[in-house]
Amino acid sequence: MKLKPIEELTFTDDFMFGRVMQNAEICKGFLERMLEIKIERIEYPELQKSISPHYQSKGIRLDVYMQDSNRVFDIEIQNSLDENLPKRTRYYQSMMDIDLLLKGKNYTELKESFVIFICKDDFFGFNLPCYSFSNTC
């Protein structure tokens, strides 16, 4: 695969997306605006975090992963339409939970989690800039 010249990279290119979001202040500002929440402090954003809890299970690689004191966030860039996006989101969220909760720990220690997909295309076709879904227990 031929690499694009750096001058042609945009925010949606994996390399550029990672470099921009690696800046904790930019990442924090993006999350606060997107989720309409206040974040006091985030730990350093981790790029391409891999989670593979079992040899035979399907592992994941999170584009940008970060935490604050009681929440975890995953920000993904999606450059093409993927009909499996809803189930992929569900799987990513469950894998993040598995990664957070060690053996012997209480379920109350699970943090609130957010999985955000930034899509170049309108996945649902309603011409909206943002779609929000909540899983509740």
Task: Give the positions of each predicted feature.
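Elongated, amphipathic alpha-helical interaction scaffolds
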Residues: 1-137
